[in-house]
Amino acid sequence: MLTKQGADLSDSFLAQGGICMLRGVDDYEDYFEDTMRAGHYENNKRAVNLMIRSSNDIIRDLLWRNVDFVRAEDGELAFTREGAHSRPRILFHEDITGKEITQTLLDQVKTKENIEICEYMTMVDIISKDNICGGVIAMDAKNNVYPIRSQFVVLACGGIGGLFQNSTNYPHIAGDGLGIAMKHQVKLEHLDYIQIHPTTLFSHKPGRRFLISESVRGEGALLYDKNGQR
């Protein structure tokens, strides 16, 4: 596993609000409609169905791995609500859910003898022959270059928020993987769709903006422009 910075400097660590799950069989249609409506009905329906249907298994797996979600007084999982959801479906850990999930999983990955985490290592190209990917070219912090050969390559490079002056993303999340994929004619889709988190703490200081959770809007907060208009 290669990461451009420290393994804990990923946008997943910054997620605050929580993670959604299906609340029961009778919740499926509402959950599906909420998701489609939030995506202006341009969503891939198969992907939406898979996300909803697999959510309970994923949560059970996270609980098995000791992710600590908040519980109600009766000991059952507690739920909050986020924007576009018609009912509370969000499991959370204080306001640092992303850190709780990702750090728990990362700690377990570090115990695996068959997984090596290479921090401060940047992928600069794909090793390709006859249109077949055979690994990557990586560069460390001292500009040393290493060919890393592999039968399988997964590009999990996040978004492009680091390209913007104002962003809740880390600055190194800059779309490198997309650029390299384009160079090698890897099929990409919907690059014109950029998700911008709408609420941050205003500051004149340069750098990453402090994220204000979606849960704030889900619990009833409203967004207004500088003229007081919604």
Give the location of each predicted region.
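Residues forming the flavin
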Residues: 1-33, 73, 94-230
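A conserved beta-strand/loop capping segment in the N-terminal third of enzymes
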Residues: 49-87, 221-222
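N-terminal beta-alpha lobe that positions the nucleotide/phosphoryl donor
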Residues: 43, 56-59, 104
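Gly-rich Lys/Arg/Thr-decorated short loops/hinges at beta-loop-alpha junctions or inter-strand turns
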Residues: 15-17, 42, 81-89, 157-161
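Glycine-rich active-site loop/strand segments that organize a redox cofactor
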Residues: 21-51
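Charge-dense, low-complexity intrinsically disordered segments
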Residues: 42-45, 49, 92-96, 168
